[in-house]
Swiss-Prot record:
Species in which this protein is naturally found: Canine adenovirus serotype 1 (strain CLL)
Keywords: DNA replication, DNA-binding, Early protein, Host nucleus, Host-virus interaction, Metal-binding, Phosphoprotein, Viral DNA replication, Zinc
Protein name, as recorded: DNA-binding protein
Entry's family note: Belongs to the adenoviridae E2A DNA-binding protein family.
Keyword Repressor: no
InterPro entries, per the entry: Ad_DBP_C_sf (IPR036367), ADBP_zn-bd_sf (IPR036368), Adenovirus_DNA-bd_a (IPR003176), Adenovirus_DNA-bd_N_sf (IPR036362), Adenovirus_DNA-bd_zn-bd (IPR005376), ADV_DNB2 (IPR037540)
Domain text: The C-terminal arm bridges DBP molecules together, thereby creating a chain.
Main location: host cell
PTM sites of type Phosphotyrosine: 129
Function as written in the Swiss-Prot or TrEMBL entry: Plays a role in the elongation phase of viral strand displacement replication by unwinding the template in an ATP-independent fashion, employing its capacity to form multimers. Also enhances the rate of initiation. Released from template upon second strand synthesis. Assembles in complex with viral pTP, viral pol, host NFIA and host POU2F1/OCT1 on viral origin of replication. Covers the whole ssDNA genome during synthesis. The complementary strand synthesis induces its relese from DNA template. May inhibit cellular transcription mediated by the interaction between host SRCAP and CBP.
Amino acid sequence: MSHKKVVAISESSSDEEVPVAPPTAPPKKRQRKAVEEPRGHQAMVEIARQATAALKARGDPGSIIVQTFCDQTVDVDKEGNVIFTPAKQKSICNKSGSPLASVASKIFKASEHKWQSAMEFALKVLNAYQVDHSKLTLLPDEGTLECFKKAVQAYITTSKMHVTYTFTNQKTFLHVAGRLLLDFVIKAAELAPGVNPSGCVVWQHGCQSSLMCLHGSPMIQKEQLVEMDVNSENAQRALKENPEKTKIVSNRWGRNVVQFKNEDAFCCSMDVNMSGGNFSGASCGMFYTDGPKAIMAFQQIMAFLKACYPSMPNAESHLLMPLKCECNWNSSLPLLGRQTCKITPFSLASASHIDKSEVDDQKMLATLNNPAMLVFQCCNPVYRNSKAAPQKNCDFKISSVDLVSCLQIAKQIWLSTVGERPPVKFPEFHWSDEHRYQTTILPQGQHDDDLVLF
């Protein structure tokens, strides 16, 4: 009897090669998420912190916080989480122990809510044009103004608007438009009644047929004598263009000079006894070298406003003008010299070559019939090739018609972003002693926390 051996062959003893598993791929690196800008409550808390820091830097008391209408203080922790903290109720008691309503506390809470409302208006304008609002504080400082200036420039670029400047530089145009948008924000939220961030006023000029100064008094016609070096370019131009008003004389040092006699100059009534180019301490600082040209410039803006707004009742009696330039826009300290923007009439010599019969637009005819224009400049401008002046100065320069365009563009931006009509409320100009020409500025010390100087 034969025995059969059964041999079990395992699968591992097969002659076939065992397939090797492919190597595992290295783990993919996670893409870094772009740092998102804070939004919502986080953005408002960040702006409130910056505003508080700006107040502290200026030496003003108080702080800005974000608070809900349920009296909850909004804050953000280190991890970026929003925290709502119930406000502590404080009661002010008199000697008898009965609680008294704190008027100051109510006003402060109301101002907090208005500040939040103003911040919402501002973010609507800035976010519509992707403007970085990291420096926005709603205070009249350079950071806040720069935000609104960028919004104006973005609106002009995106709308493909072509703005023609007449005696105006673009920097001043954006500066004034930014001030107007800030003014809309403050007025819409009723944040600071009585404050005028625009720096512009409405002036009842009364210059329909005669010139009036900022005092509201008639300006006095005064002869002006200007002496120039006989070899200078201005002297040669005066001899060539106005030979009847110029002559060569010897001055008190025995040198030959060109004397220009101007009989059409007008000055403030407070400067009648002052020599040419000087102002008294009671003066408003207004002076025109050419009175008839100044009247023509006033007639031009009156006709221009009437053509733009036929139903405007005060188009021929009032005009919008910037009262402050870049030197004193966000400062209450007086300047050495003039305190208000210098008003100068500029003539449009090229307008005389245009045929009026071919023009039907009343806005254009306003300039063709009155080829002169009011230009608002720095309070104390320093001209090229002139000697250094001690006054603070800037390159502020905008014409009356471009100021109208500036307000129109600011209104368009507000309407397209906020969705409602802007609060156009400018104070009417009235003469005050703070507008007087300052001949002397008293020295002022700087802030120092040390007990002794040295």
